[in-house]
Amino acid sequence: AANTAQDSGASLLIGHANNGAEIVANSLVLMPSADYARQICGAGSQLARMVEAYRQTDPFGELYVIAVPEATGAAATVTLTVTGAATETGTVNVYVGRTRVQAPVTNGDNVTTIASSIKDAINAVPALPFTASSSAGVVTLTARHKGLCGNEIPVSLNYYGFGGGEVLPAGVQIAVATGTAGTGAPVLTGAVAAMADEPFDYIGLPFNDTASVNTLVTEMNDTSGRWSYARQLYGHVYTAKIGTLSELVTAGDQFNQQHITLAGYEKETQTPADELAASRTARAAVFIRNDPARPTQTGELVGMLPAPKGKRFTMTEQQTLLSHGVATAYVESGVLRIQRDVTTYRKNAYGVADNSYLDSETLHTSAYVLRKLKSVITSKYGRHKLACDGTRFGPGQAIVTPAVIKGELLATYRQLERAGIVENYELFKQYLVVERDASDPNRLNTLFPPDYVNQLRVFAVVNQFRLQYSEESA
């Protein structure tokens, strides 16, 4: 067969649009650019920000979005309380998520004037996830969307500090505090219905509460979901959570699902969790489309602001997160990078430790191999008759036998081996079984036991140093 085509590996982002936005809720929309997302979802909306974060890493990949209605609940608020009059002219640098907002301050400005300047500067940037109001020296930021997701939009002052040229004007103090916590989570059943049977290899989910994740767990499951024999759509869900070590461990322990990657980030991370989820989805898409078996480690999350030095997880803490099914990231030279994309799967049905689905690359490799097999069989034997081995049919007959299919699968395995997807051909050949079903004469049963290549993650060295070798050099 001449077929060498591959699936496009489309991505999907789920999130909120602004009230009154052009996009229709719970409908699948092709999203070519961040500009188009702002146009139809609304500037500052969750979806617009997620698309922007996604496109910073994957500018060319096929991307769809689904806008979901807001939760029934409360919108998160953050307060900035100004104290002290300015004794010099300067600038207040407020970071709302990844965006720096600069508010001018003039020598002699009082708290009310400074707060008003901050409010005006924030409201002048429509792409922000908050709107601002001020009164008596207090600036109140209110999330554009109701729900828990507003609690994971960081606000801080002077992210880069003195070394980065960011300091408060003399005489001015500003305290940043959490106001009203956002409450409520959206109902995702409409979004799942909108997905229908469209294939999405990479799904970015901004909602990390247990019920929301479990809705996607059901959609992805192996029995009746996207990974079932009946649907064969496959795909993987990426979500993110910002929190303390204990909060993230608790979150990871809520799940035991191989089709979900929950990435954990430090409390002081200066990027909203929804944008982190979108960025990690994009990074996986770019890497996995190119090679599903190659590890995503070191992948740059472009434009994402990490926690500052001294506020990042230690290696021991990162290992703890991984042990509880939470994917990790690290920072090198100020750049946030993927450390390991584990899934939340840790135990089998008996509660015994199981690393079969530890790494998301294993699942992506499985999807790649299964699609390859389907492509080979349907392209070459789409309208063939089935006969037993040894049948003496004439030349030109479109007939296939178990031995023919077995030979085809062995040839395909060699192709996968050359592509660096599988290994151990001889053992695979030994264990491969293709036989005609005893009850259904139109069916071939195949036991296909691939040995996937793995990822280099640990390089162990015993450094047995010597001050001087006593033997003469050879």
List PLM regions with ranges.
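Extended Gly/Ser/Thr-rich low-complexity repeat segments
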Residues: 95, 148-165, 462-464
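Short, exposed beta-strand/loop patches in secreted or surface proteins that constitute
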Residues: 93-94, 129-134, 160-174
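A glycine-rich, acidic short-motif signal
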Residues: 41-57, 67-69, 163-169, 173-303
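Structured, hydrophobic secondary-structure cores that serve as assembly/anchoring elements
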Residues: 1-62, 297-320, 324-474
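Generic alpha-helical secondary structure
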Residues: 111-115, 119, 213, 398, ...
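Generic recognition of long tandem-repeat/solenoid scaffolds
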Residues: 78-82, 138-143, 336-340, 444-448
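Structural signature of extracellular appendage/secretion-system components
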Residues: 1-87, 91-100, 105, 143, ...
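Extended, beta-strand-rich, solvent-exposed assembly scaffolds of outer structural proteins
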Residues: 33-41, 84-154, 203, 222
